[in-house]
Amino acid sequence: MTSGGHIQLFIEHTRQIATAQGDIQLALQSMQQWREAFATALKQNTFDLTGWSPQTKIANQLKQFNHKLTTHVSNWDTEWHTFSAAQSVAEVFHDRVMLLVFGKFNAGKSSLCNLLAECFRSHEQTVQYFHVQNEQIFYTESHLREGATETTAQLQGVCLGEKLILLDTPGLHSGTQKNAALTQKFIDSADGVLWLSSATSPGQVQELDALGRELKRHKPLFPVITRSDFVEEDEIDGELCTVLCNKNSEQRALQESDVLMRAKEKLHSMQVDVSLLKPPVSVSTQMAREADMNPQAMNEAGFERLFAALLALIEPALRYKQRKPAEVLLHFLQEHIIEGLRFYLQPDLEQIQQDLKQAQDDLRQLHTDLAEAVWRSVLPELPQLLEQHASTQNIDAVVNSLNEWINVAFEQQLAIQLDAYGLNLDSLSKIEKTEKMQYERIAGMVVHDGLYTTLTQQIQQAVKASTSELIDQCQAQLEQSIKHVQTLDETFIDYSAALDQLSQALRIE
């Protein structure tokens, strides 16, 4: 059985792990204050619906956005309760470092966990297997199910000694939604991640998007290339047979370099800290087992290098664990609050801004259209109105009728062209009676040619002034809402930046 130097050193080191929490109270307090201040700022920045006509497109957009915003904020407590459910696992193992064994189905996760458990047991360390079901821990004497995790809706794991936990997950790309959801739910329990992929297709780029989330959570991540072996034909006792062999060091180095390079490129494009990605190591669990895990076989199968790398991984994982309560809260603030706003509300806000700016562009044409429509509605009626009052020459009646007609015409056109706006018609310009407004008597007949000309000019001026006043009201309403969009954008940006600063302060090492 095993007695290699790095294996022994790793096991001894895990026995000395001290997992006391660091001084994170200030960080927790700062993040809670950030959350409360952000919630207050958002609630105080809902759109003012005053000035918008109910049941119109823009009014409904703003109303729906307000509802979504306030609902999103009010759900934070419920979402936090759900998000922190993974602590039911973490609290049971609060004094141990937990490494999540991560990878797609058939990556050899359970096989590797079982072999590491045997290494610990061979060094007289306690080994205890368990599985997680319905968020409860159940201990068992059985090894982890190799190749069977896909058929279960549970996580399984093993306690190695007194201070180290390996949590084996259902396949990362499990065909079972329940498995994938369970994996994601408990992923926050881990202090570091072992990313396993088979040497037949190591480090598939499409997996890195899922890994990026863990790296953004600032957990150290260690890629392990499993099944680093091959089958060759050999003649034994005169018979041709197949023999399993380790890949040579050059082959392994080539694959490891390729995985590291592609992973770094991908993570860099995802804007995550590539320093958290550790150099990959290649192993063959099967080759180690076939030689009864003797020291030479373990070394040739890559396990001396694996344990050396795990030894280097423990320190950053331990630092993560010591600040874990603050990290879990930070993850929630980043992923559910900031990202939630970005994906749930930002598209709506962008659409509102686009529609408001389009409405501004439309006002330029509406200014002309509105004035012409009112003008054409009133002017054709003027000759008949003047004839109607010719016998009495009642200028007051003429002026009052014109003002009333202009108001009615504006009301009708506003309902057609500017129905979104709650406009104030009391401030519209009116035709005022002047000395020039008189009927004339020519050859004993009452005529109104001069009066018609004067009133035509007055109608034109009143319509023009009123149209400008109404368009100005619309413009002011649009500018107010556009400014509000900008205020919300600035609020998102400012609070995101403030949270980034809290994140950096938490992770200063």
From Swiss-Prot:
Chain ranges passing through the membrane: none
Boundaries of every G domain copy: 108-225
One Gene Ontology molecular-function label: GTP binding
Recorded superkingdom: Bacteria
Cited InterPro entries: GTP-bd, P-loop_NTPase, TRAFAC_Dynamin-like_GTPase
Alphabetical keyword list: Aromatic hydrocarbons catabolism
Pfam family, one: MMR_HSR1
GO BP term, example: catabolic process
Protein name as annotated: Uncharacterized protein ACIAD1444
Organism whose genome encodes this protein: Acinetobacter baylyi (strain ATCC 33305 / BD413 / ADP1)
